[in-house]
């Protein structure tokens, strides 16, 4: 149980997805980490616009939260995370010494939903490949400790999904960003909801949506069937997948995930 694992560690390194930084926050984490050091890492910063990151940072600051934005795959932003972890270690060491306790390597837990990039982040922090990393949910399957040079023992936990993910909007966002396995959702329904979200967010600069880019890519104006997104997908399927709506839905989602439609943020600061 996650709450039991958290009791065994000194530091939580929480990893979220920049495209959906709210949906990838664990709903119960705050009540579990009351007396723990907490570093918030928002990975995949390369997948949204720099202006969106700046505006999200302002939003988080107003809520007294100071995340580290990074692109673990390409190693950007890793130094700041390592610096923050080292500062946390020194603070924990001081606290132990003040209580007459021996200094020991601190125990840190990397935590996040499946496929938010925890393994890539750990490999960057460790400066070598210590865990498997792949763009699919569920690569990490067991708890394992990794000894780092910086006096930190890092616990790599499998991606955690709350058993009752009550917020349906969050569940949809996780599916769109491939942060939960494909077996957990119906791909055609998710593709239709994706089009609805695109049309809802099209005026928000933070979402960074180009309807022209999407329309040109598929050869059908996305505003043509604005009230019936499934009809737009059917028209696009005729052009690209011989009328196969399921294949087209899969292609649409993969195009989004691979940034073929631009650096689109599915959640924006309010």
Residue ranges of predicted features:
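Helix-rich effector regions associated with P-loop NTPase G domains
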Residues: 1-11, 19-20, 25-38, 66, ...
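Structural beta-sheet core signal
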Residues: 14, 40-42, 110
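Canonical P-loop GTPase G-domain recognition
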Residues: 45-112, 130
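Anionic group-transfer/hydrolysis microenvironments
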Residues: 16-19, 45, 125, 158
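Glycine-rich phosphate-binding P-loop
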Residues: 107-127, 131, 157
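Short, glycine/charged-enriched secondary-structure capping and boundary segments
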Residues: 27-30, 54-57, 83-84, 123-125, ...
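Active-site cofactor/substrate anionic-group-binding motifs, chiefly glycine-
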Residues: 36-46
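Short, structured loop/turn "capping" segments at alpha-beta junctions
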Residues: 92-96, 123, 129-135, 202-206
């Amino acid at each position: 149980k996650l709450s039991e694992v958290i009791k065994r560690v000194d530091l939580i390194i929480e990893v979220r997805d920049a495209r959906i930084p709210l949906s990838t926050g664990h709903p119960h984490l705050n009540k579990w980490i009351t007396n723990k050091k907490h570093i918030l890492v928002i990975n995949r910063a390369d997948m949204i616009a720099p202006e969106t990151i700046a505006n999200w940072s302002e939003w988080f600051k107003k809520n007294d939260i100071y995340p580290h934005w990074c692109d673990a795959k390409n190693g950007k932003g890793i130094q700041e995370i390592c610096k923050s972890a080292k500062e946390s270690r020194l603070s924990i060491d001081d606290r132990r010494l003040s209580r007459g306790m021996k200094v020991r390597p601190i125990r840190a837990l990397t935590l996040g939903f499946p496929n938010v990039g925890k393994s890539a982040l750990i490999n960057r922090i460790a400066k070598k490949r210590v865990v498997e990393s792949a763009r699919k949910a569920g690569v990490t399957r067991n708890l394992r400790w990794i000894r780092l040079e910086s006096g930190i023992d890092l616990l790599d936990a499998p991606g955690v999904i709350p058993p009752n993910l009550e917020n349906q909007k969050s569940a949809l966002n996780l599916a769109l960003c491939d942060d939960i396995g494909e077996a957990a959702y119906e791909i055609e329904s998710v593709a239709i909801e994706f089009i609805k979200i695109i049309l809802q967010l099209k005026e928000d600069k933070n979402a960074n949506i180009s309807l022209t880019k999407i329309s040109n890519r598929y050869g059908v104006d996305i505003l043509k069937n604005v009230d019936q997104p499934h009809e737009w997908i059917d028209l696009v399927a005729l052009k690209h997948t011989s009328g196969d709506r399921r294949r087209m839905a899969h292609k649409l989602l993969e195009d989004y995930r691979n940034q073929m439609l631009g650096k689109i943020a599915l959640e924006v600061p309010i």
